Amino acid sequence: MDFTHFNDQGRAKMVDVGEKDPSRRTAVAGARVLLNRDTFRLIQSGGVKKGDVLTVAQIAGVMGAKRTPDLIPMCHPILIDGIDLSLSLDEEHCSVEIIARVSCDGRTGVEMEALTAASVAALTVYDMCKAVQRDMVISDIRLLSKSGGVHGDFVRQE
């Protein structure tokens, strides 16, 4: 398998997707923010001074998905049909669990948009809680599934 983002001289290029037929594309990505017990309880009780951490992070994730081509150089600007983020508190692992779903009818996939959404949501959790905990860990940023396109479907086995 060859890398598609390099030209014959080995220089970076944006892949031409103009000849591809549009198809339904979906991607689901995840991320996790590991917290200490005190920070977890603050989020749970709504006691973080900057506001509702999970709601703000959800909105930030949507905004991040929409700005993906501004952040990832070879990522095509696409017309996203839907972005859905869910953030939940996992008491057992003392973490915020983030799932981002992105969909479109297009010529290229939405994996980067889903990954960016999950990442930006995680960064927002960190930003909103850094006054009370600086050693939070953002982890497990990963593609969980994708469908559509010439490379077919993918589902992570966890």
Regions found by a protein language model. Name each.
Residues 1-54, 59-76, 82-158:
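C-terminal binding/interaction regions
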